[in-house]
UniProtKB/Swiss-Prot annotation:
This is Multiple RNA-binding domain-containing protein 1. The keyword Nucleus applies. It comes from Kluyveromyces lactis (strain ATCC 8585 / CBS 2359 / DSM 70799 / NBRC 1267 / NRRL Y-1140 / WM37) (Yeast). Keywords: Nucleus, Repeat, Ribonucleoprotein, RNA-binding, rRNA processing. Residues 159-177 have a biased composition (Polar residues). Residues 2-90, 330-408, 516-588, 651-734, 752-829 form the RRM domain. The lineage of its organism: Eukaryota, Fungi, Dikarya, Ascomycota, Saccharomycotina. Residues 118-143, 159-269, 287-323, 732-751, 852-878 are annotated as: Disordered. Pfam families: RRM_1 (PF00076).
Amino acid sequence: MSRVIVKGLPIYLKEDRLRDLIEKRLTQKHQSTDVQSYLSDVKLMKNRDGESRRFAFIGFRDEEDAFDCVNYFNGTFVDTSKIEVSMAKSFADPRVPQPMREKRREALKRLREREELLLADKKDSQKKQKSDSNNDGGKKHDIDAEIAKNKQLQEFINTMKPSSQVTSWETVQSSKTQGEDEEAADDEVGEMSSNPLLSQALALKGNSRDADEDTDMFKLPGNESDDEYVSLNGGSNNANTDEPEPQMMSLDTFDTAGPTSTDDMAKDEAVSDLDWLKNRRVRIKDGADTPVSKQQQQPDTEQQQPEETEVETSQESEEEKSLKKIRETGRLFLRNILYTATEDDFRKLFSPYGELEEVHIAVDTRTGQSKGFAYVLFKNADNAATAFVELDKQIFQGRLLHILPADAKKSHKLDEFDLKNLPLKKQRELKRKANSAQQTFSWNSLYMNQDAVLSSVADKLGMKKSELIDAENSSSAVKQALAEASVIGDVRKFFETRGVDLTKFAQLKNSERDDRVILVKNFPYGTTREEIAELFLPFGKLQRLLLPPSGTIAILQFRDVPAARAAFSKISYKRFKDGIIYLEKGPSDCFTRDAQGDELVESETDIQKATAKEAKISGADLLEAQSLPAADKDDHDDDDDDDDVQAGPTVSIFIKNLNFSTTSQQLTEKFKPFNGFVVAQVKTKPDPKQPGKTLSMGFGFAEFKTKEQANAVISAMEGTILDGHKLQLKLSHRQGTSTTNASSKKKKKNQGKIIVKNLPFEATRKDVFELFSSFGQLKSVRVPKKFDKSARGFAFVEFLLPKEAENAMDQLQGVHLLGRRLVMEFVEQDPEDVEQQIEKMTRKVKKQVNTTKIANMRNSGKRKIDLDEDDENDGLQG
């Protein structure tokens, strides 16, 4: 946790003053004027009116600074207000109180869920009612038949009518004089008007008829006559009348007429219930309208079901949606990150959750600054989901890290279907270009084109390549190897004087590569600095470009990582002039200083000016320039100091009794004013309690160009005080970092004998002798052979003096003989003690005996063998 909360601030306090208070404490702790990199965020909380809420959040890059802020400021006073400082909590912390906005949101969510449950219950009840009404439709005929048969039931129904629906006595008396049939009809109509269930049964009674019948009249039960039907339609009671019978109002007429007339009739007291009922009747065709309406209702209910599922899916939480997308893409989008955060910071943060495929920080191409967001791509999408759950809304470098699901990365790779239609040669080229970013080269980092090497040496000697290499001479391969060794030596010296640490190339690993540093190889001799810059400048700004005078290899450094990646993927294996360019990512921290002078690349015009000054240089000028490289690097006013500077190994001063809080930057500032200063460094070791951090070991080194300058510094700085400690200085017996080789440990045991591995099978003893005799007097050269007299691929070379062997090792590192890179090591020295010699011989004899036993067991068919080694003294006992 690197974020703190400050409570109890004065209401008038501004962010600027709060920032000044924190920076003042950081300056005291780190003893540096530039403390902005340690402070990541200062946020004073305000209300809607812009007034301070009297608390603030402060973010630090390191947790150590956050704890120091809590211990230092907690309980102190700002003006007259006592402040309370404590570690801030993230949103994922369960102890954080829920804000009112979230409470309202959850209350609305619960209310919405209850409403949906009520709507669902209501729909279920409606469906149940519809199903019950459909079941009641089959009982209509039974009800009508029962009422028609039972006269007592009819009388009971009429008697139980409410008073508002009973007609006057005069109407009843007149209805009795019309006959029994007419009375039955009146009773039927009165019964229908008084009982709503019976009225519905009579209105829907026609639905049970056959579909082929089409009539506009209701069909009454069989015990009723046509006269009663005529009176029901409102005609005369006389059946012999010639007047046309009034027909039932059609649906169209009813729709156009509207309900106004029927409403007036309902208000008119003179209108009887029978007349009102006749005007309210609507004809329903048998088997036509009702099924259609049912069919229309059923799809409606079916269409409502998907809507319900849509509501349910829309209520899916945002976190579940995010996890679903992350499991598909495996890519995370990070925002609210620190602008000075690097890709390595996020690799350390996310690598514990799974293997990462890519980490990309968006960079502004104009300014080179981060845009404040990044992308992280996992090889396994499940690991990305786990990282999202664990790290979202957590505090990282003093800021609340906000993680969102990112879209899938756009890829322009050709699949196998597209590749199979191309020629085989084109397929291999495309695959090699696509895998160039993950490819590691088998040759040495300072690999050079052999033709460019010969052209450079021939131009340096002022002769033609045909004169340098004679095709009829058997020693042409040796001459080519010696020429390459000479060029490699010149390139090493050039890079060392330009601040390149060549020991990083010898210890190069995939995990230690820097995406911004690119080694450009295999371009033809004569390629200028301007041409290389024009090739890479379209992808982004170059921070450094180094091209040795030999013109066989170049090292460039981009300002931005995305630009370097784009250039690497686009230019790798690209045809350039009459060759193909090879690119390799350089090691991290391979530069010991910042770019200076002509190493800087600002624009194409600057490249043109620089190359115009490098027109043609003779071999003497090159040697003179290499012997005095410091004249261009230092800006001292004293000319005598510049003349004393020498190229090659630097002289180191061992500094002990350092304060454990002293940093390399403080040590550099202490020794930087002296002439000839190169670099100062405090030795550190990993902190076992805090992974990723280091602890000072209490001593360090300071390098100077000459021994005289180092002695002057020792006499001047011996006994001085730094961070309360008295410094103790003395000359170091090791060489500078610029010339330290990976095989330095082996050189201590050097006896002048070298084993040469990866030797071409075509190479003879004469070739090996001619190659190594150029560096000293040889004592013996041995090339082991097989039983058929062919070489075994290695050789032993023994020099007369160990110093000559070391010189040969340095000069021939990375040299190719007949197309193979020579790998050389010092042979393990023979033991001087007699007991050690006997022990060595014993191990050798035991190994031979075990080999013989295994062969005999295999030939005899036995499978059980004992491979356990006996005691070491068994071979000495009789």
